[in-house]
């Protein structure tokens, strides 16, 4: 069985042990899910900029706070002026930039500090790529992690 992704969704495959980035297109705007490592931030900005093809990166949504998912946030926000949305349980950790709570310092990881604009929680719904998605709590790998499900 072959699965075909919608044309409004583009997966930017990254290297081993790095989070893939997923772009959702909605007319002239786009949403990116996760941003990769801080050490790959310049490459991420270039890849996203090329993939946008003139669209505006309006929003960046993080699934959780590991460094391979939030590392490029600051660079993308600086370049594109996008809104950053984080899981609701990360509000204080990101706002105060608590590197222990974000699991950066304990794991010897890095991420450039960024400011988030809004929160998303389990059960919330959002539109991406012309489809409706529901945020699902998926604690385990990260206790605040969210996955997005298209019912």
Named regions from a protein language model:
Residues 1-55, 147-151:
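Conserved beta-strand hairpin/beta-sheet module of binuclear metal-dependent hydrolase folds
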Residues 3-9, 104-108, 129-133:
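Short Pro/Gly-enriched beta-strand edge/turn motifs at strand-loop
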Residues 17-19, 115, 121, 143-145:
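Short beta-strand-initiation
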Residues 23, 123-150:
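Core dinuclear metal-dependent hydrolase active-site scaffold
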Residues 29-31, 59, 131:
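Structural motif
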Residues 39-42, 49-128:
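Active-site HxH/HxHxD metal-binding segment of metal-dependent hydrolases
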């Amino acid at each position: 069985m072959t699965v075909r992704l919608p044309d409004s969704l583009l997966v930017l495959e990254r290297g081993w042990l790095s989070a893939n980035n997923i772009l959702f297109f909605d007319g002239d705007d786009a949403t990116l899910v996760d941003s990769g490592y801080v050490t790959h931030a310049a490459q991420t900005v270039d890849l996203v900029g090329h993939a946008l093809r003139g669209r505006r990166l309006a929003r960046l949504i993080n699934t959780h706070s590991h460094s391979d998912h939030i590392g490029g946030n600051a660079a993308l926000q600086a370049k594109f002026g996008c809104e950053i949305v984080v899981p609701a349980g990360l509000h204080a950790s990101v706002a105060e930039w608590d590197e222990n709570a974000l699991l950066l310092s304990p794991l010897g990881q890095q991420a450039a500090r960024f400011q988030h604009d809004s929160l998303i929680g389990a059960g919330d719904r959002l539109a991406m790529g012309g489809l409706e998605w529901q945020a699902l709590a998926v604690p385990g790998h990260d206790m605040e992690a969210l996955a997005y499900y298209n019912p």
